[in-house]
Swiss-Prot record:
PANTHER family: PROTEIN CPR-5. May play a role in transcriptional processes. Negatively regulates the senescence and chlorotic lesions induced by biotic (e.g. pathogens) and abiotic (e.g. sugars, darkness) agents, probably by controlling programmed cell death (pcd). Negative regulator of plant programmed cell death (PCD) and effector-triggered immunity (ETI). Promotes cell division and endoreduplication (e.g. in trichomes). Residues 29-38 have a biased composition (Basic and acidic residues). Its main location: membrane. Residues 1-87 are annotated as: Disordered. It is a multi-pass membrane protein. Keywords: Membrane, Nucleus, Transmembrane, Transmembrane helix. It is found in: Membrane; Nucleus membrane. Residues 12-28 have a biased composition (Polar residues). The lineage of its organism: Eukaryota, Viridiplantae, Streptophyta, Embryophyta, Tracheophyta. It comes from Arabidopsis thaliana (Mouse-ear cress). Changing P535S: In hys1-2; early senescence, enhanced chlorosis, hypersensitivity to sugars-mediated growth inhibition, and abnormal trichomes. Disruption phenotype: Plants are more resistant to pathogens such as P.syringea and P.parasitica and develops spontaneous lesions. This is Protein CPR-5.
Amino acid sequence: MEALLLPPSPEPQNQITNPANSKPNHQSGDVHKDETMMMKKKKDTNPSNLEKRKLKGKKKEIMDNDEASSSYCSTSSTSNSNSTKRVTRVVHRLRNPMRLGMARRSVGERQAEKLAKPLGFSLAAFANMVIARKNAAGQNVYVDDLVEIFATLVEESLANVYGNKLGSFATNFEQTFSSTLKILKLTNECANPHQSNNNDGGSCNLDRSTIDGCSDTELFERETSSATSAYEVMQGSATATSLMNELALFEETLQLSCVPPRSSAMALTTDERFLKEQTRANDLKTVEIGLQIRELRCKETALGLKFESNNLGKAALELDVSKAAFRAEKFKTELEDTRKEEMVTRIMDWLLVSVFSMLASMVLGVYNFSIKRIEDATSVCDQSEEKSSSWWVPKQVSSINSGFNTFICRVRVWVQIFFGVLMIIVFTYFLNKRSSGTKQTMPISFIVLFLGIFCGVSGKLCVDTLGGDGKLWLIVWEVFCLLQFVANVFTLALYGLMFGPINVTQETRSNRCNSMFPYWARRSVVYVVILFVLPVINGLLPFATFGEWRDFAMYHLHGGSDYA
Protein backbone atom coordinates (compact mmCIF):
# COMPACT_ATOMS: atom_id res chain seq x y z
CA MET A 1 0.00 0.00 0.00
CA GLU A 2 2.90 2.36 0.82
CA ALA A 3 4.49 1.55 -2.51
CA LEU A 4 1.28 2.62 -4.30
CA LEU A 5 0.81 5.86 -2.32
CA LEU A 6 4.50 6.87 -2.17
CA PRO A 7 6.45 6.11 -5.35
CA PRO A 8 10.21 6.14 -4.77
CA SER A 9 12.11 9.32 -5.60
CA PRO A 10 15.28 9.23 -7.67
CA GLU A 11 17.93 8.69 -4.99
CA PRO A 12 21.32 7.01 -5.03
CA GLN A 13 21.02 3.28 -4.45
CA ASN A 14 23.34 2.49 -1.57
CA GLN A 15 23.49 -0.56 0.59
CA ILE A 16 20.79 -0.49 3.27
CA THR A 17 21.83 -1.61 6.72
CA ASN A 18 19.61 -3.46 9.13
CA PRO A 19 17.73 -0.85 11.19
CA ALA A 20 16.87 -3.43 13.84
CA ASN A 21 20.52 -3.83 14.71
CA SER A 22 21.45 -1.17 17.25
CA LYS A 23 25.13 -2.09 17.35
CA PRO A 24 26.26 0.30 14.58
CA ASN A 25 24.72 3.23 16.47
CA HIS A 26 26.71 2.42 19.57
CA GLN A 27 29.79 1.92 17.48
CA SER A 28 29.17 5.30 15.82
CA GLY A 29 28.93 7.02 19.21
CA ASP A 30 32.15 5.41 20.36
CA VAL A 31 33.83 6.38 17.11
CA HIS A 32 32.69 9.98 17.56
CA LYS A 33 34.26 10.06 21.02
CA ASP A 34 37.44 8.56 19.62
CA GLU A 35 37.45 11.15 16.85
CA THR A 36 37.15 14.02 19.33
CA MET A 37 40.02 12.68 21.40
CA MET A 38 42.10 12.09 18.29
CA MET A 39 41.51 15.66 17.11
CA LYS A 40 42.66 17.06 20.46
CA LYS A 41 45.76 14.88 20.42
CA LYS A 42 46.49 15.90 16.82
CA LYS A 43 46.49 19.55 17.79
CA ASP A 44 48.85 18.87 20.69
CA THR A 45 51.24 16.33 19.14
CA ASN A 46 52.02 14.97 15.70
CA PRO A 47 50.87 11.30 15.37
CA SER A 48 53.16 8.52 14.23
CA ASN A 49 52.79 6.53 10.99
CA LEU A 50 51.02 3.64 12.76
CA GLU A 51 48.55 6.00 14.33
CA LYS A 52 48.00 7.63 10.93
CA ARG A 53 47.13 4.24 9.36
CA LYS A 54 44.72 3.45 12.21
CA LEU A 55 43.20 6.89 11.83
CA LYS A 56 42.72 6.33 8.09
CA GLY A 57 40.95 2.99 8.75
CA LYS A 58 38.65 4.59 11.25
CA LYS A 59 37.94 7.44 8.84
CA LYS A 60 36.97 4.96 6.12
CA GLU A 61 34.69 3.08 8.51
CA ILE A 62 33.03 6.33 9.58
CA MET A 63 32.52 7.32 5.94
CA ASP A 64 30.84 3.96 5.22
CA ASN A 65 28.59 4.38 8.24
CA ASP A 66 27.65 7.87 7.08
CA GLU A 67 26.78 6.62 3.60
CA ALA A 68 24.73 3.75 5.02
CA SER A 69 22.95 6.16 7.35
CA SER A 70 22.11 8.54 4.50
CA SER A 71 20.82 5.70 2.30
CA TYR A 72 18.84 4.37 5.21
CA CYS A 73 17.16 7.77 5.63
CA SER A 74 16.16 7.75 1.95
CA THR A 75 14.22 4.48 2.37
CA SER A 76 12.64 5.31 5.73
CA SER A 77 9.08 5.24 4.32
CA THR A 78 8.99 1.42 4.03
CA SER A 79 7.88 0.81 7.63
CA ASN A 80 6.87 2.94 10.62
CA SER A 81 9.12 1.18 13.11
CA ASN A 82 12.18 1.65 10.86
CA SER A 83 11.33 5.34 10.32
CA THR A 84 11.32 5.89 14.09
CA LYS A 85 14.83 4.47 14.36
CA ARG A 86 15.98 6.58 11.42
CA VAL A 87 14.71 9.79 13.13
CA THR A 88 16.68 8.80 16.23
CA ARG A 89 19.83 8.34 14.17
CA VAL A 90 19.31 11.69 12.40
CA VAL A 91 18.98 13.47 15.75
CA HIS A 92 22.07 11.65 16.98
CA ARG A 93 24.04 12.85 13.96
CA LEU A 94 22.75 16.41 14.54
CA ARG A 95 23.94 16.24 18.14
CA ASN A 96 27.36 14.97 16.99
CA PRO A 97 28.12 17.08 13.91
CA MET A 98 31.88 16.53 13.89
CA ARG A 99 33.18 14.00 11.38
CA LEU A 100 36.77 13.16 10.78
CA GLY A 101 35.80 12.39 7.16
CA MET A 102 35.10 16.11 6.66
CA ALA A 103 38.47 17.27 7.90
CA ARG A 104 39.71 17.99 4.42
CA ARG A 105 36.72 20.21 3.58
CA SER A 106 36.38 23.82 4.62
CA VAL A 107 34.58 24.97 7.70
CA GLY A 108 31.91 26.72 5.61
CA GLU A 109 31.11 23.57 3.64
CA ARG A 110 30.82 21.52 6.82
CA GLN A 111 28.54 24.07 8.42
CA ALA A 112 26.41 24.24 5.20
CA GLU A 113 26.08 20.46 5.15
CA LYS A 114 25.09 20.48 8.82
CA LEU A 115 22.48 23.10 8.05
CA ALA A 116 21.06 21.13 5.04
CA LYS A 117 19.34 18.49 7.15
CA PRO A 118 17.62 20.83 9.67
CA LEU A 119 16.57 23.01 6.75
CA GLY A 120 15.15 19.92 5.02
CA PHE A 121 13.27 18.99 8.20
CA SER A 122 11.73 22.44 8.60
CA LEU A 123 10.79 22.85 4.95
CA ALA A 124 9.35 19.32 4.90
CA ALA A 125 7.13 20.19 7.89
CA PHE A 126 6.07 23.37 6.12
CA ALA A 127 5.42 21.50 2.84
CA ASN A 128 3.44 18.88 4.73
CA MET A 129 1.11 21.60 6.01
CA VAL A 130 0.72 22.92 2.47
CA ILE A 131 -0.07 19.41 1.19
CA ALA A 132 -2.59 18.93 3.99
CA ARG A 133 -4.25 22.21 3.08
CA LYS A 134 -4.37 21.29 -0.61
CA ASN A 135 -5.80 17.88 0.21
CA ALA A 136 -8.46 19.49 2.39
CA ALA A 137 -9.40 21.68 -0.59
CA GLY A 138 -9.67 18.60 -2.83
CA GLN A 139 -6.43 19.23 -4.76
CA ASN A 140 -3.97 16.37 -4.98
CA VAL A 141 -0.26 17.20 -4.75
CA TYR A 142 2.32 14.54 -5.56
CA VAL A 143 5.19 14.24 -3.14
CA ASP A 144 7.82 13.36 -5.75
CA ASP A 145 6.98 16.40 -7.84
CA LEU A 146 7.08 18.65 -4.78
CA VAL A 147 10.43 17.20 -3.69
CA GLU A 148 11.90 17.74 -7.15
CA ILE A 149 10.61 21.33 -7.24
CA PHE A 150 12.01 22.23 -3.79
CA ALA A 151 15.36 20.55 -4.48
CA THR A 152 15.78 22.31 -7.83
CA LEU A 153 14.74 25.65 -6.34
CA VAL A 154 17.15 25.46 -3.40
CA GLU A 155 20.02 24.18 -5.56
CA GLU A 156 19.62 26.93 -8.20
CA SER A 157 19.10 29.66 -5.60
CA LEU A 158 22.24 28.76 -3.63
CA ALA A 159 24.22 28.18 -6.82
CA ASN A 160 23.34 31.67 -8.05
CA VAL A 161 24.48 33.24 -4.77
CA TYR A 162 27.40 31.07 -3.57
CA GLY A 163 28.33 28.95 -6.56
CA ASN A 164 29.86 25.56 -5.79
CA LYS A 165 31.13 26.48 -2.33
CA LEU A 166 28.46 24.56 -0.39
CA GLY A 167 29.57 21.02 -1.34
CA SER A 168 26.87 18.37 -0.96
CA PHE A 169 24.37 20.75 0.62
CA ALA A 170 21.78 20.26 -2.15
CA THR A 171 22.03 16.45 -2.07
CA ASN A 172 21.67 16.25 1.71
CA PHE A 173 18.80 18.74 1.62
CA GLU A 174 16.97 16.76 -1.08
CA GLN A 175 17.35 13.44 0.77
CA THR A 176 16.33 14.92 4.11
CA PHE A 177 13.41 16.85 2.64
CA SER A 178 12.12 13.84 0.66
CA SER A 179 12.35 11.33 3.51
CA THR A 180 10.89 13.73 6.10
CA LEU A 181 8.02 14.80 3.85
CA LYS A 182 7.12 11.18 3.07
CA ILE A 183 7.25 10.28 6.76
CA LEU A 184 4.99 13.20 7.69
CA LYS A 185 2.55 12.41 4.88
CA LEU A 186 2.46 8.76 5.91
CA THR A 187 1.93 9.86 9.52
CA ASN A 188 -1.05 11.99 8.52
CA GLU A 189 -2.54 9.18 6.47
CA CYS A 190 -2.10 6.75 9.38
CA ALA A 191 -3.68 9.21 11.78
CA ASN A 192 -6.74 9.67 9.50
CA PRO A 193 -7.09 6.43 7.46
CA HIS A 194 -10.67 7.26 6.36
CA GLN A 195 -9.61 10.67 4.95
CA SER A 196 -6.50 9.64 3.04
CA ASN A 197 -7.66 11.49 -0.08
CA ASN A 198 -8.71 14.61 1.86
CA ASN A 199 -6.13 14.79 4.63
CA ASP A 200 -5.79 17.95 6.74
CA GLY A 201 -3.10 16.73 9.18
CA GLY A 202 -4.94 17.93 12.29
CA SER A 203 -4.40 14.77 14.32
CA CYS A 204 -0.70 15.36 14.81
CA ASN A 205 -1.32 18.62 16.77
CA LEU A 206 0.88 20.82 14.54
CA ASP A 207 0.66 24.60 14.88
CA ARG A 208 -0.72 25.99 11.62
CA SER A 209 -1.11 29.60 12.73
CA THR A 210 1.81 30.57 10.53
CA ILE A 211 0.22 29.26 7.33
CA ASP A 212 -3.51 29.78 7.84
CA GLY A 213 -3.34 33.43 6.72
CA CYS A 214 -0.74 33.04 4.00
CA SER A 215 -1.32 32.46 0.33
CA ASP A 216 0.69 30.22 -1.96
CA THR A 217 2.69 33.17 -3.34
CA GLU A 218 3.70 34.34 0.12
CA LEU A 219 4.75 30.81 1.04
CA PHE A 220 6.91 30.60 -2.06
CA GLU A 221 8.51 34.02 -1.32
CA ARG A 222 9.28 32.97 2.23
CA GLU A 223 10.86 29.76 0.96
CA THR A 224 13.00 31.70 -1.51
CA SER A 225 14.12 34.22 1.10
CA SER A 226 15.04 31.42 3.49
CA ALA A 227 17.15 29.84 0.79
CA THR A 228 19.01 33.07 -0.05
CA SER A 229 19.80 33.79 3.59
CA ALA A 230 21.21 30.34 4.19
CA TYR A 231 24.81 31.56 4.38
CA GLU A 232 23.92 34.20 6.98
CA VAL A 233 22.22 31.57 9.04
CA MET A 234 25.43 29.51 8.89
CA GLN A 235 27.20 32.21 10.91
CA GLY A 236 24.70 31.88 13.73
CA SER A 237 24.13 28.20 13.32
CA ALA A 238 24.32 27.47 17.02
CA THR A 239 20.87 28.90 17.67
CA ALA A 240 19.44 27.29 14.51
CA THR A 241 21.03 23.98 15.39
CA SER A 242 19.44 23.93 18.81
CA LEU A 243 16.14 24.94 17.24
CA MET A 244 16.41 22.18 14.63
CA ASN A 245 17.27 19.67 17.31
CA GLU A 246 14.11 20.60 19.16
CA LEU A 247 12.16 20.33 15.87
CA ALA A 248 13.68 16.90 15.22
CA LEU A 249 12.78 15.76 18.70
CA PHE A 250 9.27 17.07 18.17
CA GLU A 251 9.03 15.27 14.82
CA GLU A 252 10.30 12.09 16.49
CA THR A 253 7.66 12.36 19.20
CA LEU A 254 5.02 13.17 16.58
CA GLN A 255 6.16 10.24 14.47
CA LEU A 256 6.02 7.86 17.41
CA SER A 257 2.62 9.18 18.49
CA CYS A 258 1.18 8.83 15.00
CA VAL A 259 2.65 5.43 14.22
CA PRO A 260 -0.19 2.84 14.14
CA PRO A 261 0.13 -0.60 15.65
CA ARG A 262 1.64 -1.94 12.43
CA SER A 263 3.00 -5.03 14.08
CA SER A 264 -0.48 -5.90 15.30
CA ALA A 265 -1.86 -5.15 11.81
CA MET A 266 0.80 -7.40 10.31
CA ALA A 267 -0.10 -10.05 12.89
CA LEU A 268 -3.76 -9.67 11.99
CA THR A 269 -2.88 -9.92 8.30
CA THR A 270 -0.86 -13.05 9.02
CA ASP A 271 -3.71 -14.51 11.04
CA GLU A 272 -6.17 -13.65 8.29
CA ARG A 273 -3.94 -15.31 5.72
CA PHE A 274 -3.54 -18.30 7.99
CA LEU A 275 -7.31 -18.47 8.47
CA LYS A 276 -7.85 -18.15 4.72
CA GLU A 277 -5.33 -20.89 4.02
CA GLN A 278 -6.88 -23.02 6.74
CA THR A 279 -10.34 -22.38 5.29
CA ARG A 280 -9.09 -23.23 1.83
CA ALA A 281 -7.43 -26.38 3.18
CA ASN A 282 -10.66 -27.29 4.95
CA ASP A 283 -12.61 -26.69 1.73
CA LEU A 284 -10.17 -28.85 -0.21
CA LYS A 285 -10.41 -31.48 2.51
CA THR A 286 -14.21 -31.29 2.30
CA VAL A 287 -14.07 -31.70 -1.47
CA GLU A 288 -11.64 -34.59 -1.06
CA ILE A 289 -13.91 -36.23 1.52
CA GLY A 290 -16.87 -35.66 -0.81
CA LEU A 291 -14.97 -37.32 -3.64
CA GLN A 292 -14.05 -40.19 -1.34
CA ILE A 293 -17.68 -40.53 -0.29
CA ARG A 294 -18.73 -40.49 -3.94
CA GLU A 295 -16.09 -43.10 -4.71
CA LEU A 296 -17.30 -45.22 -1.80
CA ARG A 297 -20.87 -44.84 -3.05
CA CYS A 298 -19.74 -45.88 -6.52
CA LYS A 299 -18.00 -48.87 -4.99
CA GLU A 300 -21.13 -49.64 -2.99
CA THR A 301 -23.20 -49.40 -6.16
CA ALA A 302 -20.70 -51.62 -7.96
CA LEU A 303 -20.86 -54.12 -5.11
CA GLY A 304 -24.66 -54.00 -5.26
CA LEU A 305 -24.54 -54.60 -8.99
CA LYS A 306 -22.09 -57.45 -8.48
CA PHE A 307 -24.37 -58.85 -5.79
CA GLU A 308 -27.36 -58.64 -8.12
CA SER A 309 -25.26 -60.12 -10.90
CA ASN A 310 -24.21 -62.94 -8.61
CA ASN A 311 -27.84 -63.49 -7.64
CA LEU A 312 -28.82 -63.54 -11.29
CA GLY A 313 -25.97 -65.93 -12.01
CA LYS A 314 -27.05 -68.07 -9.08
CA ALA A 315 -30.64 -68.02 -10.31
CA ALA A 316 -29.40 -68.90 -13.80
CA LEU A 317 -27.35 -71.76 -12.36
CA GLU A 318 -30.34 -72.95 -10.36
CA LEU A 319 -32.46 -72.72 -13.51
CA ASP A 320 -29.83 -74.66 -15.42
CA VAL A 321 -29.72 -77.24 -12.64
CA SER A 322 -33.51 -77.44 -12.70
CA LYS A 323 -33.43 -77.83 -16.46
CA ALA A 324 -30.76 -80.49 -16.17
CA ALA A 325 -32.74 -82.26 -13.44
CA PHE A 326 -35.90 -81.98 -15.54
CA ARG A 327 -34.07 -83.34 -18.56
CA ALA A 328 -32.60 -86.12 -16.46
CA GLU A 329 -36.02 -86.90 -15.02
CA LYS A 330 -37.56 -86.75 -18.46
CA PHE A 331 -34.85 -88.98 -19.84
CA LYS A 332 -35.30 -91.31 -16.90
CA THR A 333 -39.06 -91.38 -17.47
CA GLU A 334 -38.57 -92.03 -21.15
CA LEU A 335 -36.02 -94.68 -20.32
CA GLU A 336 -38.41 -96.27 -17.83
CA ASP A 337 -41.20 -96.20 -20.39
CA THR A 338 -38.89 -97.76 -22.93
CA ARG A 339 -37.76 -100.42 -20.46
CA LYS A 340 -41.36 -101.05 -19.48
CA GLU A 341 -42.44 -101.49 -23.07
CA GLU A 342 -39.52 -103.80 -23.67
CA MET A 343 -40.42 -105.76 -20.55
CA VAL A 344 -44.10 -106.03 -21.54
CA THR A 345 -43.12 -107.30 -24.96
CA ARG A 346 -40.74 -109.73 -23.32
CA ILE A 347 -43.51 -110.97 -20.97
CA MET A 348 -45.85 -111.53 -23.91
CA ASP A 349 -43.13 -113.47 -25.64
CA TRP A 350 -42.66 -115.46 -22.47
CA LEU A 351 -46.39 -116.22 -22.40
CA LEU A 352 -46.38 -117.35 -26.00
CA VAL A 353 -43.38 -119.58 -25.48
CA SER A 354 -44.91 -120.96 -22.27
CA VAL A 355 -48.19 -121.86 -24.07
CA PHE A 356 -46.32 -123.72 -26.78
CA SER A 357 -44.28 -125.55 -24.16
CA MET A 358 -47.49 -126.48 -22.29
CA LEU A 359 -49.17 -127.77 -25.48
CA ALA A 360 -46.13 -129.89 -26.30
CA SER A 361 -46.16 -131.34 -22.81
CA MET A 362 -49.91 -132.07 -23.04
CA VAL A 363 -49.44 -133.85 -26.37
CA LEU A 364 -46.67 -135.92 -24.83
CA GLY A 365 -48.81 -136.81 -21.83
CA VAL A 366 -51.87 -137.63 -23.93
CA TYR A 367 -49.83 -139.79 -26.28
CA ASN A 368 -48.22 -141.80 -23.54
CA PHE A 369 -50.93 -142.09 -20.90
CA SER A 370 -54.37 -141.07 -22.35
CA ILE A 371 -54.82 -143.15 -25.56
CA LYS A 372 -56.52 -145.97 -23.70
CA ARG A 373 -58.72 -143.46 -21.95
CA ILE A 374 -59.70 -141.93 -25.29
CA GLU A 375 -60.56 -145.42 -26.61
CA ASP A 376 -62.65 -146.05 -23.54
CA ALA A 377 -64.43 -142.77 -24.13
CA THR A 378 -65.19 -143.67 -27.73
CA SER A 379 -66.17 -147.25 -26.81
CA VAL A 380 -69.07 -145.87 -24.88
CA CYS A 381 -70.57 -144.82 -28.18
CA ASP A 382 -70.18 -148.42 -29.53
CA GLN A 383 -71.88 -149.99 -26.51
CA SER A 384 -74.81 -147.66 -26.82
CA GLU A 385 -75.15 -148.68 -30.45
CA GLU A 386 -75.40 -152.36 -29.56
CA LYS A 387 -77.94 -151.72 -26.83
CA SER A 388 -80.15 -149.60 -29.11
CA SER A 389 -81.19 -152.52 -31.46
CA SER A 390 -84.86 -153.73 -30.94
CA TRP A 391 -87.21 -156.38 -32.39
CA TRP A 392 -89.86 -154.14 -33.72
CA VAL A 393 -87.32 -151.81 -35.48
CA PRO A 394 -86.02 -152.99 -38.79
CA LYS A 395 -82.36 -153.73 -38.99
CA GLN A 396 -81.76 -151.16 -41.70
CA VAL A 397 -83.33 -148.42 -39.67
CA SER A 398 -81.62 -149.49 -36.51
CA SER A 399 -78.22 -149.62 -38.25
CA ILE A 400 -78.69 -146.11 -39.61
CA ASN A 401 -79.83 -144.89 -36.23
CA SER A 402 -76.92 -146.51 -34.41
CA GLY A 403 -74.40 -145.14 -36.89
CA PHE A 404 -75.80 -141.66 -36.45
CA ASN A 405 -75.69 -141.94 -32.69
CA THR A 406 -72.12 -143.22 -32.81
CA PHE A 407 -71.08 -140.30 -35.00
CA ILE A 408 -72.76 -137.83 -32.70
CA CYS A 409 -71.08 -139.39 -29.69
CA ARG A 410 -67.68 -139.40 -31.30
CA VAL A 411 -68.09 -135.79 -32.49
CA ARG A 412 -68.98 -134.76 -28.97
CA VAL A 413 -65.94 -136.57 -27.61
CA TRP A 414 -63.55 -135.07 -30.18
CA VAL A 415 -65.07 -131.65 -29.71
CA GLN A 416 -64.46 -131.90 -25.99
CA ILE A 417 -60.96 -133.08 -26.70
CA PHE A 418 -59.99 -130.37 -29.15
CA PHE A 419 -62.05 -127.45 -27.77
CA GLY A 420 -59.46 -126.57 -25.15
CA VAL A 421 -56.67 -127.06 -27.67
CA LEU A 422 -58.54 -124.80 -30.08
CA MET A 423 -58.98 -122.12 -27.45
CA ILE A 424 -55.29 -122.30 -26.56
CA ILE A 425 -54.33 -122.08 -30.25
CA VAL A 426 -56.58 -119.02 -30.73
CA PHE A 427 -55.11 -117.44 -27.60
CA THR A 428 -51.61 -118.13 -28.88
CA TYR A 429 -52.46 -116.52 -32.21
CA PHE A 430 -53.66 -113.34 -30.53
CA LEU A 431 -50.59 -113.24 -28.34
CA ASN A 432 -48.33 -113.64 -31.34
CA LYS A 433 -50.17 -110.86 -33.16
CA ARG A 434 -49.95 -108.45 -30.21
CA SER A 435 -46.33 -109.22 -29.49
CA SER A 436 -45.37 -108.47 -33.08
CA GLY A 437 -46.75 -104.90 -32.78
CA THR A 438 -44.88 -101.96 -31.23
CA LYS A 439 -45.85 -100.24 -27.99
CA GLN A 440 -48.56 -102.78 -27.23
CA THR A 441 -49.51 -103.64 -23.68
CA MET A 442 -51.61 -106.44 -22.32
CA PRO A 443 -54.61 -105.08 -20.42
CA ILE A 444 -55.55 -106.49 -17.05
CA SER A 445 -59.03 -107.42 -18.27
CA PHE A 446 -57.53 -109.58 -20.98
CA ILE A 447 -55.38 -111.45 -18.47
CA VAL A 448 -58.16 -111.91 -15.91
CA LEU A 449 -61.13 -112.64 -18.17
CA PHE A 450 -59.70 -114.34 -21.18
CA LEU A 451 -56.73 -116.19 -19.74
CA GLY A 452 -58.02 -116.91 -16.28
CA ILE A 453 -61.66 -117.72 -16.96
CA PHE A 454 -62.30 -118.74 -20.54
CA CYS A 455 -59.00 -120.44 -21.19
CA GLY A 456 -59.01 -122.06 -17.75
CA VAL A 457 -62.54 -123.52 -18.09
CA SER A 458 -62.04 -124.72 -21.66
CA GLY A 459 -58.66 -126.21 -20.81
CA LYS A 460 -60.12 -128.04 -17.79
CA LEU A 461 -62.86 -129.60 -19.98
CA CYS A 462 -60.29 -130.56 -22.61
CA VAL A 463 -58.02 -132.20 -20.05
CA ASP A 464 -60.94 -134.00 -18.48
CA THR A 465 -62.00 -135.28 -21.92
CA LEU A 466 -58.48 -136.44 -22.68
CA GLY A 467 -58.42 -138.40 -19.49
CA GLY A 468 -56.30 -136.08 -17.41
CA ASP A 469 -56.84 -134.27 -14.10
CA GLY A 470 -58.62 -131.07 -15.10
CA LYS A 471 -58.56 -129.53 -11.61
CA LEU A 472 -54.78 -129.85 -11.32
CA TRP A 473 -54.35 -128.35 -14.74
CA LEU A 474 -56.64 -125.44 -13.83
CA ILE A 475 -54.69 -124.72 -10.61
CA VAL A 476 -51.33 -124.67 -12.39
CA TRP A 477 -52.84 -122.56 -15.16
CA GLU A 478 -54.15 -120.00 -12.70
CA VAL A 479 -50.69 -119.78 -11.09
CA PHE A 480 -49.22 -119.14 -14.51
CA CYS A 481 -51.82 -116.44 -15.22
CA LEU A 482 -51.09 -114.87 -11.81
CA LEU A 483 -47.42 -114.60 -12.66
CA GLN A 484 -48.36 -112.96 -15.94
CA PHE A 485 -50.61 -110.51 -14.07
CA VAL A 486 -47.83 -109.58 -11.63
CA ALA A 487 -45.33 -109.18 -14.46
CA ASN A 488 -47.68 -106.81 -16.32
CA VAL A 489 -48.61 -104.77 -13.25
CA PHE A 490 -45.14 -104.50 -11.64
CA THR A 491 -43.15 -104.36 -14.81
CA LEU A 492 -40.43 -101.96 -13.58
CA ALA A 493 -40.00 -103.89 -10.35
CA LEU A 494 -39.56 -107.10 -12.32
CA TYR A 495 -37.12 -105.27 -14.60
CA GLY A 496 -35.15 -104.04 -11.57
CA LEU A 497 -35.16 -107.55 -10.14
CA MET A 498 -33.83 -108.99 -13.35
CA PHE A 499 -31.65 -106.17 -14.76
CA GLY A 500 -31.07 -103.80 -11.87
CA PRO A 501 -32.26 -100.20 -11.24
CA ILE A 502 -32.59 -97.75 -14.09
CA ASN A 503 -29.77 -95.15 -13.91
CA VAL A 504 -29.48 -92.07 -16.09
CA THR A 505 -25.73 -91.83 -15.63
CA GLN A 506 -23.25 -94.58 -16.21
CA GLU A 507 -22.42 -95.00 -12.55
CA THR A 508 -21.96 -98.44 -11.07
CA ARG A 509 -23.01 -99.12 -7.51
CA SER A 510 -22.04 -102.32 -5.78
CA ASN A 511 -25.16 -103.52 -3.99
CA ARG A 512 -25.07 -106.24 -1.38
CA CYS A 513 -28.07 -107.95 -2.92
CA ASN A 514 -26.40 -107.76 -6.29
CA SER A 515 -23.26 -109.32 -4.87
CA MET A 516 -25.25 -112.15 -3.27
CA PHE A 517 -27.57 -112.82 -6.25
CA PRO A 518 -26.17 -111.57 -9.52
CA TYR A 519 -28.58 -110.30 -12.13
CA TRP A 520 -27.69 -113.03 -14.58
CA ALA A 521 -28.64 -115.66 -11.96
CA ARG A 522 -31.95 -113.92 -11.33
CA ARG A 523 -32.72 -113.74 -15.02
CA SER A 524 -31.86 -117.43 -15.40
CA VAL A 525 -34.22 -118.41 -12.56
CA VAL A 526 -37.10 -116.34 -14.01
CA TYR A 527 -36.58 -117.73 -17.48
CA VAL A 528 -36.48 -121.34 -16.25
CA VAL A 529 -39.57 -120.98 -14.06
CA ILE A 530 -41.74 -119.15 -16.58
CA LEU A 531 -40.56 -120.77 -19.80
CA PHE A 532 -39.92 -124.37 -18.69
CA VAL A 533 -41.05 -125.39 -15.21
CA LEU A 534 -44.64 -124.14 -15.12
CA PRO A 535 -45.58 -125.12 -18.70
CA VAL A 536 -44.10 -128.64 -18.29
CA ILE A 537 -45.84 -129.14 -14.97
CA ASN A 538 -49.12 -127.90 -16.41
CA GLY A 539 -48.79 -130.18 -19.45
CA LEU A 540 -47.53 -133.43 -17.86
CA LEU A 541 -48.82 -133.75 -14.29
CA PRO A 542 -52.57 -133.77 -15.18
CA PHE A 543 -52.06 -136.97 -17.19
CA ALA A 544 -49.64 -138.87 -14.95
CA THR A 545 -48.06 -138.55 -11.55
CA PHE A 546 -44.48 -137.56 -10.94
CA GLY A 547 -43.49 -141.20 -10.24
CA GLU A 548 -45.09 -142.41 -13.45
CA TRP A 549 -43.22 -139.76 -15.43
CA ARG A 550 -40.00 -140.78 -13.65
CA ASP A 551 -40.50 -144.45 -14.54
CA PHE A 552 -41.33 -143.43 -18.09
CA ALA A 553 -38.12 -141.48 -18.35
CA MET A 554 -36.07 -144.32 -16.85
CA TYR A 555 -37.68 -146.84 -19.24
CA HIS A 556 -36.75 -144.80 -22.30
CA LEU A 557 -33.28 -144.09 -20.98
CA HIS A 558 -32.55 -147.80 -20.45
CA GLY A 559 -34.02 -148.89 -23.76
CA GLY A 560 -37.34 -150.26 -22.38
CA SER A 561 -35.90 -153.52 -20.98
CA ASP A 562 -36.77 -152.94 -17.38
CA TYR A 563 -40.10 -151.21 -17.91
CA ALA A 564 -42.99 -153.45 -16.85
